[in-house]
Every structure is written in C-alpha cells, then in structure tokens.
C-alpha cells in the first residue's frame, strides 16, 4: 500500500513539474505584462447565476475560444483588495487578474486600451462588472499597465487566449500576438493558418430577466473571419477573386492590418462551401469560423 501511495505521489509530482515547465512567459515572448500562461483543463459545462434580477450564462471553453469584444473597462476599487473572488481566490490588486460576467474562470484574455494601444494579459478569476455597458473589471495592476488609472474607465478590446496541453496558443488573441512576437519561438507557439481553422461558438452576452419562465429561442448564425491582410487593396482583391456577390463581405481595420468578415450565413453548408472556395484560391492567411446566437 505504501509503495502504491508513493507511486501515485510521484506521478502527481511529475504532472505538476511538466505543467510548471510549460508555463509561458508572455513578457519574454510578446513583450506583455501578465501572469505566466498555464494550460487549464477545458470547461465543458456552463451554468447560470443571477445578480440584481438578471440571469447570466457562463461560457464553456469551446464557446469562448473566439471571444473578441470592444467595450468599456473599469478597475477594482481599493476596498476589494483582500476579498474573496468568485473563483475562491483572494483578490490581490498587484496581480494581473480581472472579472468578466461569462468567460470561463481561470481563462486568459488580452486587453488593449484602444486610446493608446497599450496591452496587458489578465487571468479571469472573478465575475462582474455588473454595471451597464462595462465588459471587464481589471485589477489595479492591469489598469495601471494600460493607462486606465487616471480616467477610471476606458474603451478596450478583449480577446481570449487559449492554450493546449503542449502550451500552444490559439483563440481570438492569436492574430494580435503574432504581430507582437519577439522571436521565432513566440511565432511557433501560435496556432495559425490553414491547419488550425477552428469552428468556435461565439456566444453573445445576452441577459434575461430572472422572472422569465420560458427560455428564449435563438437562431445560430455563422461568419467567416480572415485575419491579417496587408492592405485594403489586398482584401478587396480577395473578395473579387472569390466572386460571390450573394455573400456580404465587410473589411475592418485591425491596427496596421485588415480583416474580412464574410456572412452572416444561416446554413453551415454555406460556410463549408465558402471555405472550400478560399482553399482553392490557395489562401493561407489565418481563417476562423464563428457561430453565434442571433
């Protein structure tokens, strides 16, 4: 029995060592402040909770993988320092953490201050902010890093970061991280391109009054997003080569690059058809398929 217990403890120590060894230093690889990035087991079940009469549904890891939102960020008041968070951890204003209403606890996000383009990585370990119009509540350290202390609130972009067991990075933030890579190792950590096309459920943060007795019905809608084109002209050329006048195509500016959104599509077969056409064009830019509830 003692030998068996020893073997189990040894195995657990090995697992802990491997996981620790795979911690990613975002400062070294991408020049970003934040916690060490460590693989977390995927969250496979969502749950509901109610605050101030409003019901929220948390996202699974699969649903959250394409999460990218622009909105208003705030940061914790000093009085919350030392209090317990929704994850059970104690809030420490000097660590890079944040509160979000629906993203999985212990997931990571890249937060960009859209006024000055300063960035920080934070770990979600709490729920909130429960103030209308705000999408994330940052720790004081994170807010300071992106220049929010003076204003108190700011317009930000929040993009999810996901890691697999090998420590490779995917999720909505991967395109932004690719532009920040300091070396080849940083580039190699990112899952991008044709081999990493992902089908991700992009769930809007819809709120329903707790008094509602029947769940609302939503229609699943799909969009295709192509990342990191070098110019608007290149984006327009790709749309022209695709030759699909029946499909809406929107070009958006992403810092010094351009993205294309095709859709919305109400049928997954349409999505697969357009993906196949893009492949025939030998298109190699990162391609993500989003689904969301309309």
UniProtKB/Swiss-Prot annotation:
Its EC number(s): 4.2.2.-
UniProt-listed InterPro entries: RlpA (IPR034718), RlpA-like_DPBB (IPR009009), RlpA-like_sf (IPR036908), RplA (IPR012997), SPOR-like_dom (IPR007730), SPOR-like_sf (IPR036680)
Keywords, sorted A to Z: Cell wall biogenesis/degradation, Lyase, Signal
A GO BP annotation: peptidoglycan metabolic process
PANTHER family: ENDOLYTIC PEPTIDOGLYCAN TRANSGLYCOSYLASE RLPA
Family statement drawn from the similarity comment of this UniProt entry: Belongs to the RlpA family.
Record's protein name: Endolytic peptidoglycan transglycosylase RlpA
Record organism: Pasteurella multocida (strain Pm70)
């Amino acid at each position: 029995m003692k030998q068996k217990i020893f073997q189990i403890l040894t195995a657990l120590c090995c697992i802990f060592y491997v996981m620790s060894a795979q911690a990613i230093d975002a400062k070294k690889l991408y020049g970003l402040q934040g916690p060490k990035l460590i693989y977390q087991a995927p969250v496979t079940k969502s749950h509901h909770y109610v605050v101030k009469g409003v019901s929220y549904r948390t996202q699974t890891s699969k649903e959250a993988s394409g999460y990218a939102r622009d909105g208003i960020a705030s940061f914790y008041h000093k009085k919350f320092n030392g209090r317990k968070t929704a994850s059970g951890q104690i809030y420490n204003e000097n660590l890079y953490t944040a509160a979000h209403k629906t993203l999985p606890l212990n997931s990571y996000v890249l937060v960009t201050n859209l006024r000055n383009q300063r960035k920080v990585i934070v770990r979600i370990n709490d729920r909130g902010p429960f103030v209308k119009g705000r999408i994330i509540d940052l720790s004081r350290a994170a807010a300071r890093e992106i220049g929010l202390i003076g204003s108190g609130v700011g317009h930000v972009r929040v993009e999810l970061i996901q890691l697999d067991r090998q420590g490779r990075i995917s999720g909505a933030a991967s395109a932004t991280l690719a532009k920040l890579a300091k070396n080849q190792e940083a580039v190699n950590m990112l899952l991008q391109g044709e081999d990493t096309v992902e089908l991700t459920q992009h769930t809007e943060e819809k709120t329903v009054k707790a008094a509602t007795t029947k769940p609302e019905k939503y229609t699943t809608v799909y969009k295709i997003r192509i990342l990191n084109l070098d110019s608007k002209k290149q984006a327009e050329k790709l749309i022209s080569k695709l030759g699909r006048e029946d499909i809406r195509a929107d070009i958006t500016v992403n810092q010094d690059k351009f993205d294309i959104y095709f859709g919305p599509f109400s049928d997954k077969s349409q999505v697969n058809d357009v993906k196949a056409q893009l492949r025939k064009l030998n298109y190699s830019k990162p391609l993500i398929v989003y689904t969301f509830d309309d």
